[in-house]
């Protein structure tokens, strides 16, 4: 999502709608049939995750919540999201409903902050959160420990949550140790410490640790400094450095080293699975920055990347949204050197993959939060390969049961725009605006 402010999950971090790819905080590009009544932020969140004792701020202050956490010696888990946001609903459907997350939530104070509730935007400014979703861990005294990545799979998320809760050192101090010029100035970092750096939610950092313009260079330094014994972690850091170098158009990336790291991931099924989020949500960015256009190296890398993605599309250990993300990445890679010629027919095998994947998502997903996350992206996937009528049909069938149907209307508006139907695009966009809920959402529309 370039137009939406999604945090990878901001792609996730948030598959690719010209709407979505990396962080939900602005409304999508355009959009859908008679409006239905969407759930309000309050009612939707009240229905969700009954096993979690969510604490909701009363106004624009968390002082009382942090004071009680300190008195009870409990860390604080802060969730910042929105009812309509696909990546937020992905976390609800794959993480917050897990029995182990619900059980673990008894050990911390879970704070639920919806961006459309009174005072939320002021709190967002205070805690430096913008992209939806953002999840932050704080020590009982209110010190920020780390920001967790929303784009990783649920098992990885739970592992990182456990590591974050067991840590006594803020990630800011860990970063300073990792970058220290004098290796003897600080204790050697553990494997878990390096892993927390590699999986830190850099996309939602909001310059808390590193100024945005220095982020790609910092990740490159981390990749180079990471001990050889932690090769998997070093490879992920290099993937992150490459992705952010592409996004920020930053100079200084060692493309040869980055290409070698990328190849070590895409050619290894275990590493590829561990970095499924990177392969799905940053495919074009990374390939473009580590290989020259039209080069044999690019052609070989795209072939290897596609082979890895084909395994991820059918990997039952991934969520439906992540499987769909892999299919979207395959489509994205077809336009690696420029948009496809609309006059040329699409590859039949790719069309079959897209149709089958979208249909499987629609048929198999029953959880309403997961549907809010996946169905708009499945519809976008269809429209991205020119199947606009099939995309429209999926979206219109979903409107009566969607958590936030106005989001789906934006995709319908986008489809109409692609057809050259200006009146239809405006009509769906107006319906989406009329049906939207929440002051922040409506302001950003």
Predicted features and spans:
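A short beta-strand-turn-helix
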Residues: 56-75
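Conserved redox-active cysteine motifs that mediate thiol-disulfide chemistry
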Residues: 80-96
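Non-catalytic, surface beta->alpha helical segment in thiol-disulfide oxidoreductase systems
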Residues: 130-171
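Solenoid-like repeat scaffolds
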Residues: 180-185, 220-228, 263-273, 308-321, ...
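Thiol-based oxidoreductase modules, predominantly thioredoxin-like and allied folds used
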Residues: 54-59, 80-81, 98-120
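Bacterial signal peptide processing site
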Residues: 24-28
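Helix-turn-helix repeat elements of alpha-solenoid scaffolds
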Residues: 167-172, 206-218, 249-263, 294-311, ...
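Generic helix N-cap/helix-start motif at coil->alpha-helix transitions
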Residues: 186-193, 229-240, 270-283, 317-338, ...
């Amino acid at each position: 999502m370039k137009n939406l402010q999604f945090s990878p999950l901001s792609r996730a971090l948030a598959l690719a709608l010209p709407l979505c790819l990396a962080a939900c905080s602005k409304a999508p590009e355009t959009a859908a049939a008679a409006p239905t009544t969407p759930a309000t932020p309050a009612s939707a969140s009240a229905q969700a995750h009954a096993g979690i004792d969510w604490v909701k701020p009363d106004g624009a202050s968390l002082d009382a919540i942090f004071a009680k956490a300190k008195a009870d010696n409990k860390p604080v888990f802060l969730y910042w999201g929105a009812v309509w946001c696909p990546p937020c609903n992905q976390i609800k459907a794959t993480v917050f409903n897990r029995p182990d997350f619900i059980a673990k939530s008894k050990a911390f104070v879970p704070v639920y902050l919806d961006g459309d509730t009174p005072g939320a935007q002021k709190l967002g400014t205070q805690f430096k959160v913008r992209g939806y979703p953002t999840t932050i861990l704080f020590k009982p005294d209110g010190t920020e420990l780390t920001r967790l990545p929303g784009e990783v799979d649920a098992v990885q998320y739970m592992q990182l949550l456990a590591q974050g809760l067991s840590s006594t050192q803020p990630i800011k101090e860990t970063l300073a140790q990792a970058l220290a010029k004098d290796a003897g100035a600080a204790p050697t970092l553990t494997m878990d410490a390096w892993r927390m750096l590699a999986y830190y939610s850099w996309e939602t950092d909001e310059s808390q640790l590193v100024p945005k313009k220095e982020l790609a260079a910092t990740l490159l330094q981390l990749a180079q400094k990471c001990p050889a014994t932690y090769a998997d972690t070093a490879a992920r850091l290099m993937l992150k450095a490459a992705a952010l170098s592409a996004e920020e158009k930053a100079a200084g990336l060692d493309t040869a080293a980055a290409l070698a790291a990328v190849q070590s991931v895409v050619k290894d099924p275990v590493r590829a699975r561990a970095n499924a989020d990177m392969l799905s949500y940053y495919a074009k960015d990374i390939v473009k920055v580590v290989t020259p256009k039209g080069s044999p190296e690019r052609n070989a890398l795209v072939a290897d990347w596609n082979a890895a993605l084909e395994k991820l599309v059918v990997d039952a250990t991934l969520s439906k949204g992540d499987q769909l993300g892999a299919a979207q990445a395959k489509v994205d890679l077809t336009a690696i050197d420029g948009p496809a010629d609309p006059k040329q027919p699409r590859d039949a095998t790719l069309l079959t993959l897209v149709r089958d994947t979208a249909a499987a998502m629609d048929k198999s997903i029953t959880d309403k939060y997961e549907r809010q996350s996946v169905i708009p992206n499945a519809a976008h996937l269809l429209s991205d390969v020119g199947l606009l009528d099939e995309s429209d049909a999926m979206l219109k069938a979903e409107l009566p049961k969607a958590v936030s149907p106005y989001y789906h209307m934006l995709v319908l508006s986008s489809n109409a725009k692609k057809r050259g139907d200006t009146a239809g695009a405006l009509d769906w966009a107006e319906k989406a605006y009329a049906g939207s809920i929440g002051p922040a959402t409506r302001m950003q529309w």
